[in-house]
């Protein structure tokens, strides 16, 4: 519907921010380019996004914030936001199942009482804001949320209501990379025959450093980033 600008055609500060994201994730999320046709709005959009999503409080974690996005975006039928933020939710909650459950039916998802109360209020703000009153907000205070936390719940719901509609307006589809993010731990690259021969020809210190580094990083992703749900290869294949 709308032409998507190329990286070469957008202002340098936008290009620099997009490069930072690509360096961290390995790809450029499509929404970054879809919205770049309006640079001033792009800057305001992502500044507001970061202010809401990159902070954390005792009662409202980064993972909770992403679940708000997934639940409200599902209610608003926004494919891009459900898939993209579902991927981030899997990583930030360290729970590969929860984002799919929340996207499909958050009311039946494996949530604790605090998370369920947060999503109940967030969805009300997103789809029927006229029903939100002091009694509704009081349910969040009962779960330890401060007034600032409650403001964030409302702001995230409102901000992504706009984001959902912009994604639909621009027909922005999720990147393929989002679908596997947070589902499987990162593993060392598989060396092909020619690469193995090159490795064997290297001096032994280089070979030792390489293999040791791959072993350490693989263990890190399995035990630190995804503890408990993928203890061994057999567990992944049987699930």
Q: What are the roles of these predicted feature ranges?
A:
Residues 1-239:
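Hydrophobic alpha-helical segments
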């Amino acid at each position: 519907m709308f032409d998507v600008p190329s990286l070469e055609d957008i202002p340098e500060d936008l290009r620099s921010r997009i490069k930072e994201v690509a360096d961290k994730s390995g790809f450029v999320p499509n929404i970054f380019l879809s919205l770049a046709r309006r640079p001033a709005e792009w800057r305001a959009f992502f500044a507001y996004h970061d202010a809401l999503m990159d902070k954390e409080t005792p009662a409202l974690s980064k993972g909770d914030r992403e679940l708000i996005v997934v639940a409200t975006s599902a209610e608003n039928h926004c494919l891009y936001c459900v898939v993209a933020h579902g991927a981030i939710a899997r990583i930030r909650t360290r729970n590969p199942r929860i984002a799919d459950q929340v996207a499909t039916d958050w009311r039946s998802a494996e949530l604790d009482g605090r998370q369920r109360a947060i999503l109940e209020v967030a969805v009300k703000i997103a789809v029927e804001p006229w029903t939100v009153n002091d009694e509704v907000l009081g349910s969040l205070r009962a779960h330890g949320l401060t007034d600032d936390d409650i403001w964030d719940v409302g702001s995230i719901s409102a901000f992504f209501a706009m984001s959902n509609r912009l994604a639909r307006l621009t027909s922005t589809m999720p990147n393929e990379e989002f679908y596997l993010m947070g589902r499987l731990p990162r593993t060392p690259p598989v060396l092909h025959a020619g690469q193995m021969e090159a490795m064997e020809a290297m001096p032994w210190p280089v070979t030792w450093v390489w293999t040791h580094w791959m072993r350490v990083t693989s263990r890190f992703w399995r035990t630190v980033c995804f503890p408990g749900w993928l203890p061994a290869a057999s567990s992944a294949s049987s699930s």
